[in-house]
Amino acid sequence: MREFLVIGLAAGIILILWKSRLNYLLLPSLPVSAGKDPLDLTVIIPARNEAHQIARAVQSFPGLPVIVVDDASSDETAHAARAAGAQVISPPPLSPGQKGKPTACAEGARYATTKWLLFVDADTWFDSPFAASIVAYAEGAGVPFVTAFLEQRCQSLAEKALLPYAFALYFTGVSARAVNNPTSHQALANGQCILFERAVYESIGGHAAVEESVIEDVALARHAKQKGVPVRVMRAEHLGHVRMYDGFAAIWRGFQKNSFRFLVINPWSGLQVILASILLTSWLPVLILGLADYPKPSGAMLLAPTPVAILFLAPLLSLLPWYRGWRVILAPSAIYGFQLIALNGMFTTLTRRATLWKGRRV
């Protein structure tokens, strides 16, 4: 009986992680294009306490108008952005319920006059063909809302361990076909990189329509689809890069703020993520249970052609594409470490506790 449990769990883990990777790879890859010159595009960067990295984001777009919306920073963000060549503006004070990022994005859009608006985060940077490529794709495909996932750059051990697993888990609940299907209710966007045709953006209310949402990117995509606006979710790891968090404390706060809210805003996706998480966290207990069937278990057994060996290797081999090499040995710690982070996020959301994020309670 235990052997069937071990084999069944191994098969389930392989299947769910294979599905996750396939969901990601089925997102279309952004083609590299020279595009038109000059581009009818304004780049908008909401920024709060980003003095250490805002210049890199601004300088990714030479020759293009860049608006940095300085969201009441307490550091030298505004000075660094101006020095890098950006126009710097400030949003109005937040009203009760408003969130900083969507309000900043909405204010930046008010100052833009171009056909296209490109919203990017301050912790992103892009290769020179990116802007032309994403505009050329949007115009060629006739899609007014294009969002792209970027290459995740990880430096600390916590980032290298936790973030690849977090994305693998995230995509267990994402259907690439559904998010890019105008008739599907499933919506997805990556707020690190959103291109929007300004006339369409304004016609549906833009970020102001989701100004009370902490996960404004998914809320904006859902709002757009409800208004009949087609959304295209893509991959652009070859042209865009991001370092989301700079260590464990930032990861903890970031997912405390976002993780459970994503599950709530996309219930079907959330259910799949929860089931995948339960399956994966069953790995170690069932592995120990399987080893109990052997009178003298040893490490060598985990590499022999046995059911427990298959279970032992199932998450490691299945997560290998997300970790890209030796870092996959960190995956077991991520399976259980991220579970604690997710449970903390759920507790924080359900009890309506605030998260301190960049000096502001959200």
What are these regions (language model features)?
Residues 117:
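Short aromatic/hydrophobic "clamp" motif used to bind/position activated sugar donors
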Residues 52-56, 75-84:
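Acidic helix N-cap motif at the loop->helix transition within catalytic regions
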Residues 138, 145-170, 199-202, 207-269, ...:
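Catalytic donor/gating beta->alpha subdomain of glycosyltransferases that bind UDP-sugars
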Residues 21-31, 50-63:
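Short, well-formed alpha-helical segments that are part of the catalytic scaffolds
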Residues 70-79, 93:
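A conserved acidic beta->alpha catalytic loop
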Residues 1-37, 163-164, 176:
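N-terminal membrane-anchoring/stem segments of glycan-assembly enzymes
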Residues 76, 122-137:
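Acidic donor-binding/catalytic loop of UDP-sugar-dependent glycosyltransferases
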Residues 273, 277-352:
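Membrane-embedded multi-pass helical conduit in multi-pass membrane proteins
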